[in-house]
């Protein structure tokens, strides 16, 4: 079975598998085993790309600032740092930049999420690194892209998706746009697209081509994600307004309904045969459930009234194992216990922290469960020596690079730079 092939762990009662922690991934596992990646530390999409590559078996080394801080910096919960090793290097010191170039010289990939021009000013830009490693794939993650009138301005996910038209399209009729967390821009249109670009460029190198720069912009990726909606719009089958279409809460049979206990059910009964099954199980006569658009408001009220007669879980039992396309809306903490996710071990537990398992799954080159997130500077000395960085001892003594050892959860740091 695929789940057993990939994970091979006994499931917990909470729907996850329990595996031991440890910085970095076991060697030689996953389809990207043997691929070396240098990640210049940042937040959001670039670290997510690094996590994806690590989950697939790549050896990922994150370059942290010695005095920097992560959004989540306790050594256990920074899940975007899982499966990576960390080196702490002062990039503002020319000797630190030289150390990063040494790392890049033996790497397959470097990824960074700085504003355009910052990496160049630090001496670790594409030209600096390619001079020693022409096969290097250099991945760049930004919101606006490397060029254009806004390229050098600040921004965040919500602003990037706002100008693409996608944010405008999410929400209910007559209401402001709904904020889809930062999943759509930062991660879907950002880090995921950077990973796709990096993998495509790696394939090119494997076939004898040269390394190259991958310019991944959240505005580009988010726009690309919306290709289907643009196709519907061009075909005259989509109205450029919220809550008026088949898939945006306009249609009452693609909607979320409240149950008697305040829980919710998600309905996606689009196809006629699935819709007929949905009406039967809900107890709504077919003639009452007619789907013509001019009857949508009346139909929505009918369906809402029916759902209010039972609790969320009672309705989930009614629709279980059917083709009605109805599912309970679960919270983040409830999700791991869902029978399908539990059966597939979609969640795992590492060092006591429940988290999503790597995806997708590979029958021939299964990925190992991720190691715990690296502490800042935890692997500085071992990585620099292992990767052949010149003058490692001098760099440690001068504090250009810092080796730190911490007990996870206790945050007791031992600075070994002066050993």
Q: What does each of the following model-derived ranges do?
A:
Residues 77-81, 154-159, 232-233, 343-346:
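Short, hinge-like loop/turn segments at secondary-structure boundaries
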Residues 42, 91, 115-116, 142-143, ...:
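Short glycine-/small-residue-rich Rossmann-like dinucleotide-binding loops
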Residues 1-67, 132, 137-139, 224-419:
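Acyl-CoA thioester-binding alpha/beta core of soluble enzymes
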Residues 78-97, 102, 160-168, 353-367:
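Redox-cofactor-proximal catalytic regions of oxidoreductases
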Residues 25, 52, 56, 106, ...:
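Active-site-adjacent "lid/gating" segments in soluble enzymes
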Residues 46, 96, 118-120, 146, ...:
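Short glycine-rich, flexible loops that bind phosphorylated cofactors or substrates
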């Amino acid at each position: 079975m695929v789940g057993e092939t990939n994970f091979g762990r006994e499931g917990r009662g909470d729907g996850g598998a329990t595996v031991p922690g440890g910085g970095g991934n076991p060697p030689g596992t996953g389809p990207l085993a043997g691929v070396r990646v240098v990640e210049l530390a940042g937040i959001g999409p670039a670290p997510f790309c690094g996590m994806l590559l690590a989950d697939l078996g790549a050896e990922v080394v994150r370059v942290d600032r010695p005095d920097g801080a992560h959004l989540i910096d306790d050594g256990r919960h920074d899940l975007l740092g899982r499966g990576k090793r960390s080196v702490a290097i002062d990039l503002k010191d020319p000797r630190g930049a030289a150390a990063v170039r040494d790392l890049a010289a033996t790497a397959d990939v470097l990824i960074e999420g700085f504003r355009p021009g910052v990496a160049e000013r630090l001496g670790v830009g594409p030209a600096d690194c390619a001079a020693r490693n022409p096969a290097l794939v250099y991945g760049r993650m930004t919101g606006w892209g490397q060029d254009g009138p806004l390229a050098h301005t600040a921004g965040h996910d919500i602003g990037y998706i706002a100008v693409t038209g996608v944010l405008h399209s999410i929400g209910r009729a007559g209401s402001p746009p709904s904020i889809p967390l930062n999943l759509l821009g930062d991660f879907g249109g950002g880090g995921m697209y950077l990973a796709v670009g990096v993998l495509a460029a790696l394939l090119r190198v494997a076939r004898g081509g040269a390394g190259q720069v991958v310019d991944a912009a959240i505005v580009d990726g988010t726009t690309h994600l919306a290709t289907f909606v643009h196709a519907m719009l061009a075909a005259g089958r989509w109205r450029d307004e919220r809550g008026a279409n088949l898939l945006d809460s306009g249609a009452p049979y693609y909607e979320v309904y409240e149950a008697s206990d305040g829980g919710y059910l998600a309905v996606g009964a689009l196809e006629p045969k699935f819709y007929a099954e949905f009406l039967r199980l809900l107890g709504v006569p077919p003639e009452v459930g007619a789907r013509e658009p001019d009857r949508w408001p009346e139909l929505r009220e009918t369906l809402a009234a029916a759902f209010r007669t039972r609790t969320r879980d009672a309705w989930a039992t009614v629709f279980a194992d059917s083709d009605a396309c109805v599912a309970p809306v679960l919270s983040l903490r409830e999700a791991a216990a869902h029978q399908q996710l539990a059966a597939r071990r979609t969640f795992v537990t590492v060092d006591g922290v429940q988290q999503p398992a790597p995806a997708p799954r590979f029958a021939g080159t299964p990925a190992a469960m991720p190691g715990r997130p690296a502490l800042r500077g935890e692997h500085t000395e071992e990585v620099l020596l292992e990767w052949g960085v010149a003058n490692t001892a001098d760099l440690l003594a001068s504090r250009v690079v810092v080796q730190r050892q911490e007990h996870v959860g206790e945050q007791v740091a031992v600075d070994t730079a002066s050993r």
